[in-house]
Amino acid sequence: MSASQLETTEPADIVGQLQRAASAEDFFELLDVDFDPKVVNVARLHILKRMGQYLASEDLDGLPSAETKARCKTVLERAYADFVESSPLDQRVFKVLKDAVAPKSPRRPAFVSLDNLK
């Protein structure tokens, strides 16, 4: 989505605009959130995933568009702040990163009953 498209879209349907956004930068521009491109370049997917996690606990149905946009902006700012202060490895938003540090369950030795041997 180009900058001109972002500016000409109606502000009433911010959720729809966010769903059509083509990049993390579009989210920041749509919601008027300042960001450091260096942080976004490293953690773009992590920031958007965390934003989604935070939004899951928000009830946006039936809210006026200005309130919806304000809540989305607050959630994006919170998600972005998580990655300004620490790295994606520290935050472990994605399952693959969580699994990398999960304690391994002890492996049971293979057991074959003598009755099964012939």
UniProtKB/Swiss-Prot annotation:
Keyword Kinase annotated: no
Keyword DNA-binding: no
A biological-process GO annotation: nitrogen fixation
UniProt entry keywords in alphabetical sequence: Nitrogen fixation
InterPro entries, A to Z: NifW
Quaternary structure (record): Homotrimer; associates with NifD.
Job description of the protein: May protect the nitrogenase Fe-Mo protein from oxidative damage.
NCBIfam families reported in the protein's UniProt record: PRK00810.1
Family named by the database record: Belongs to the NifW family.
Name of this protein: Nitrogenase-stabilizing/protective protein NifW
Species assigned in the record: Rhodopseudomonas palustris (strain BisB5)
Gene: nifW
